Amino acid sequence: MCNDDTVNELKKDFHYTLSKFSHEIRNPLTLINSGLQMIASAHPEAEDYEHWDDVMDNLSYVRELLDELSAFNNAGRVKPEATDTGMYLKTVLSSVKPTLDYLDIRLVTDIPNDLPTLMLDRIQIRQMLLNLLKNAWEAVPVPGGQISVTAFTEKSGICINIQDNGCGISKEQLASIFQPFFTTKENGTGLGLAISRQVAEAHHGSISIESTPGPRQTHE
């Protein structure tokens, strides 16, 4: 059985390896992307090539994967600051409202003004919330989708409930939903929910999902 020192050393090695891997991949990826942009600039007809969009989409996917690997690597290391949680949540939700309006998805919110001030890493909590909201809006029907977000004080913290009228997932999928790289989406990285759980736990919280096949899914 590993002792705490061994576990911590393994974690440090893992974080270092993941960071180095991301760095080593990102540099040539940037050069490839720049090279393709130069080709397109010098030879506009290149964009008419039938697989050009596929190439650019794949590059975008790898960039997104590297960004999420970096977020996953840093999710447990927080820089908390005193945060008015009510105002903060309203700001985050306002930032996604234009996207949801464009997609014709209704956003219903109930965020009290008297939520407590908490020590939060605002960048990481924002990413966690955006991951959960993105999961919701990708699951709901368009048009006709609805996402409800409520928050309330619970013990020494708050509970945030995100509910949607999407298609839901099976019990088997639910058992693996927080595992890194597990995804039910064709172009998903499978890291969003794993990152979200790490962020919640780094703030001494937890995250859970209730879902069954059919409409209605809840994140807390």
Describe these PLM feature segments.
Residues 101, 106-116:
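Conserved catalytic submotifs in the C-terminal HATPase_c
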Residues 192, 196:
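Short alpha-helical Gxxx[C/S/T] motif in the catalytic ATP-binding
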Residues 49-99:
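Conserved DHp (HisKA) dimerization/phosphotransfer helix of two-component histidine kinases, i.e.
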Residues 76-78, 117-120, 184:
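Conserved micro-motifs of the catalytic ATP-binding
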Residues 169-181:
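Short conserved segment of the HATPase_c
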Residues 146-156:
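Short beta-strand/loop element within the Bergerat-fold HATPase_c
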